[in-house]
């Protein structure tokens, strides 16, 4: 039996593509464009795992498909190479993070090339290259000039173990850091912020213009968190102080019986009475040790302290005790709430715990037993009594505005983006602080502001980054003799990844971020493939920066990514014990088809789980490529199931994909290829071209491969294979298995040219129609023969064909035929005696 030798074929074609620059981005202005983008990877020390190639293979198939359809294709790759892991490694080993990063990139690139992806490597970007981050810094200076980058003393999520502050989005639901799982505490610090809130409404509205999964759009909508309601001003009794509350339900103001301020609210110290001062100070201290997520956990016990002061309810003049509680955040809304315990579960629990008044203002429910959170007509509400929700809100807003104690307002959950990191391995923020108290951006002519090489990269512990230790870089003097210090904070890893897709369009431009005409030609990105875990962070930040650049006239589109696709996760083989705990694969043995814990002897259940080093179930693509070949890995990952499903890795599935490719190889290299078409494969060939073309376009790669298998099965039943169909089939399979595709194309054509730009096959609509049908012949109600006949034969013709059949004649010999019932295209029933 013939098998193809992937160890010879694959390196041969990879060298051919590299030597001939086969995948150089097309520039023919008469052709349509297609920009296929992968989320570029962080080049970790671990290298690629088999999850990476799933998305990369999908965009590669589309890129190869579109090239064959006559598109200019931009399909680039690069490296998101700043960030904490390299710095952590450098601190642990004493090595330079730049060296570590360069080694990792070389390894990633080797692995990627071994998989046969059609990237245009002339467009490679690296976020740590000064020629790249010059433009990251340039964008920052533009944000600064527009007032969208500013410094503020803000409570930050401080991670002591990392020596840096992190963004809200990087805090996990359990209150630990996304990177490393360390405890997060709140701590006030001077930080750089980006005013993403200025774009909240546009970030929300323009989601309607993009073809993204609805689940991702919803996550962004929820993160932006638009609320329509009213601001209400409360005066503090016996003082000249007041505070503002935002509420979506101003109609329930008659039911507001107490107010709660965030412990960090600026008014707290000013209104706290002397006998409550100690309790308030103690509570503030405790609150500062908790993350926002821990503080707002609905399940946690309600805690709080009374300030000793009262606010006056503007609508009825009643006194409301003012409390502080950690479930109110200074960073959300106004940092103050009016509590309506009769109609809000959290307020109700708090009121019950601290014995505060509960006054129902909506009809229905028993507020002594639980908060009534449904809608009802208003009661106990003076001029709102008897009104429904919408009417009451409108009337209350009108009253608040007339009385000068409130106004209609829209607020957003979205907070400004905490942009500074107290670390070394990031882009230096191009700002100088002068001793006269002013700050200026580094002029464009002096960019890039290069990150200085230093051995001392441990966090300073003072809240400044290690750059504070590099004095010859840090200290500067202006022409007029005024001394200054450079900003020591660096940018977060999200900075370089917020605009990299633009640099791919014009990566070697030294004069500007990218040429306007090229940006017009290539934007927006046609397909962006990556993990759903980036739904809020990267995708929201990139959209924000893109809109700023749109306002500056740098980019021609409002949105960066027209279509987004999230691939599923490839799960590893893993095992669970009776408690549900996962057991590492090296602690498992197989006996008689069952799995047992090596140490305890307990029988284990096999269950897929995320691949991880600790479970020792990570599959390295290098091993798969060596044993089965890159084409097998590509076909297997596309055939596992729908691209967006999470599916368990299977060696059997891998072997099945290899066997299929061997059958393809045998079909083309051992079957007699003929210039004459017998017509036997007309229907299945044209069906295959139609199905594969449509399914690749829709990213239904698993069903496209299934159809290719149908063709192979049909072709194997024939003695000869029509050469046009052989070539067309090889073209169809080439995007999935490109090395094999090239090899078989040469076997058929000996052209010496790559298959990559050969026009995609077309199908003949008329050949899709079935010209023959199978009918059954029944005698005494039992099927005695099956006949393939021309479609739409008349009753008489059908009867004639059936009675002429040898099997039928043997059955009816010597018998009397009573009658024959013929149903065109279905059956012939013969009644005999």
UniProtKB/Swiss-Prot annotation:
It catalyses: tRNA(Leu) + L-leucine + ATP = L-leucyl-tRNA(Leu) + AMP + diphosphate. GO terms for biological process: leucyl-tRNA aminoacylation. GO terms for cellular component: cytosol. The keyword Ligase applies. ATP binds at residue 613. It is found in: Cytoplasm. A motif ('KMSKS' region) lies at residues 610-614. Its EC number is 6.1.1.4. SUPFAM superfamilies: Anticodon-binding domain of a subclass of class I aminoacyl-tRNA synthetases (SSF47323), Nucleotidylyl transferase (SSF52374), ValRS/IleRS/LeuRS editing domain (SSF50677). One of its GO terms (molecular function) is leucine-tRNA ligase activity. It holds the Pfam family tRNA-synt_1_2. Keywords: Aminoacyl-tRNA synthetase, ATP-binding, Cytoplasm, Ligase, Nucleotide-binding, Protein biosynthesis. Belongs to the class-I aminoacyl-tRNA synthetase family. This is Leucine--tRNA ligase. It comes from Streptococcus pyogenes serotype M12 (strain MGAS2096). The gene is leuS.
């Amino acid at each position: 039996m013939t098998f193809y030798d992937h160890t010879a074929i694959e390196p041969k074609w990879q060298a051919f593509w590299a030597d001939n620059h086969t995948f150089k981005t097309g520039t023919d202005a008469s052709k349509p464009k297609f920009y296929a983008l992968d989320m570029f990877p962080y080049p970790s020390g671990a290298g690629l795992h088999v999850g990476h190639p799933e998305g990369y293979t999908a965009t590669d198939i589309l890129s190869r498909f579109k090239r064959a359809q006559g598109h200019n294709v931009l399909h680039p790759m690069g490296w998101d190479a700043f960030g904490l892991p390299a710095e952590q490694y450098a601190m642990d080993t004493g090595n330079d993070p730049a060296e570590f990063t360069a080694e990792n990139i070389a390894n990633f690139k080797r692995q990627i090339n071994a998989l046969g992806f059609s990237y245009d490597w002339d467009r490679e970007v690296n976020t740590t290259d000064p020629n790249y981050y010059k433009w990251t810094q340039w964008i920052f200076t533009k944000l600064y000039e527009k007032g969208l980058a500013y410094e503020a003393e803000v409570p930050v999520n401080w991670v002591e173990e990392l020596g840096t502050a992190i963004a809200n989005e990087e805090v996990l639901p359990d209150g630990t850091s996304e990177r490393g799982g360390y405890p997060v505490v709140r701590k006030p610090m001077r930080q750089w912020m980006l005013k993403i809130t200025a774009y909240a409404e546009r970030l929300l509205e323009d989601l309607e213009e993009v073809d993204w999964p609805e689940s991702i759009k919803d996550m962004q909508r929820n993160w932006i968190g638009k609320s329509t309601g009213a601001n209400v001003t409360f005066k503090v009794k016996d003082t000249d102080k007041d505070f503002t509350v935002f509420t979506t339900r101003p109609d329930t103001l008659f039911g507001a019986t107490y107010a709660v301020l965030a412990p960090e609210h600026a008014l707290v110290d000013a209104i706290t009475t002397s006998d409550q001062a100690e309790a308030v100070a103690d509570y503030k201290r405790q609150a500062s040790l908790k993350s926002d997520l821990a503080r707002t956990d609905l399940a946690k016990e309600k805690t709080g302290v009374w300030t000793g002061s009262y606010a006056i309810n503007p609508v009825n003049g009643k006194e409301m005790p003012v409390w502080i509680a950690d479930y109110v955040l200074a960073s959300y809304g106004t940092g103050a709430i009016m509590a309506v315990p009769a109609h809000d579960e959290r307020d109700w629990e708090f009121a019950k715990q601290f014995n505060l008044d509960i006054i129902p203002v909506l009809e229905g429910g028993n507020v002594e037993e639980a908060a009534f959170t449904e809608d009802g007509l208003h009661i106990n509400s003076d001029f709102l009594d008897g009104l429904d929700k919408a009417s009451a809100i409108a009337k209350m807003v009108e009253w608040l505005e007339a009385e000068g104690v409130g106004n209609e307002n829209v607020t957003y959950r979205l907070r400004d983006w905490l942009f500074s990191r107290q670390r070394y391995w990031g882009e230096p923020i191009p700002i100088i602080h002068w001793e006269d108290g002013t700050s200026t951006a580094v002029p464009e002519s002096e960019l890039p502001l290069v990150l200085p090489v230093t051995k001392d990269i441990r966090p300073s512990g003072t809240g400044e980054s290690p750059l504070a230790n590099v004095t010859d870089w840090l200290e500067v003097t202006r022409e007029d003799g005024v001394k200054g210090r450079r900003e020591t904070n660096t940018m977060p890893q999200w900075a370089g990844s917020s605009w990299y897709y633009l640099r791919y369009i014009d990566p070697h431009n030294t004069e500007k971020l990218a040429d306007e005409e090229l940006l017009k030609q290539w934007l927006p990105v046609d397909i962006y493939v990556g993990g759903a875990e980036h739904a809020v962070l990267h995708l929201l930040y990139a959209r924000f920066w893109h809109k700023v650049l749109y306002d500056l006239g740098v980019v021609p589109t409002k949105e960066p990514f027209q279509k987004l696709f999230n691939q599923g996760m490839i799960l590893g083989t893993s095992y669970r014990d009776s408690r549900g705990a996962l057991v590492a694969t090296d602690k498992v043995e197989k006996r008689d088809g069952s799995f047992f814990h090596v140490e305890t002897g307990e029988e284990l259940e096999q269950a897929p789980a995320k691949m991880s080093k600790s479970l020792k179930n990570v599959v390295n693509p290098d091993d798969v490529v060596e044993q089965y070949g890159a084409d097998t890995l590509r076909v297997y990952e596309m055939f596992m199931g729908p691209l967006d499903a999470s599916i368990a890795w299977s060696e059997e599935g891998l072997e099945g994909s290899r066997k299929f490719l061997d059958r393809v190889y045998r079909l083309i290299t051992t079957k007699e290829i003929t210039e004459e078409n017998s017509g036997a494969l007309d229907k299945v060939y044209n069906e295959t071209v139609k199905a594969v073309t449509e399914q690749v376009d829709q990213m239904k790669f698993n069903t496209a491969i299934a159809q290719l298998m149908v063709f192979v099965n049909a072709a194997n039943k024939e003695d000869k294979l029509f050469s046009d169909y052989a070539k067309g089939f090889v073209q169809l399979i080439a995007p999935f298995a490109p090395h094999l595709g090239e090899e078989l194309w040469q076997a058929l054509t000996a052209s010496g040219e790559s298959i990559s730009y050969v026009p995609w096959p077309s199908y003949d609509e008329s050949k899709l129609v079935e010209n023959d049908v199978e009918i059954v012949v029944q005698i005494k109600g039992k099927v005695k023969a099956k006949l393939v006949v021309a479609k739409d034969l008349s009753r008489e013709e059908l009867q004639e064909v059936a009675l002429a059949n040898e099997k039928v004649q043997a059955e009816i010999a010597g018998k009397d035929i009573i009658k024959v019932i013929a149903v065109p295209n279905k059956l012939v029933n013969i009644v005999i005696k």
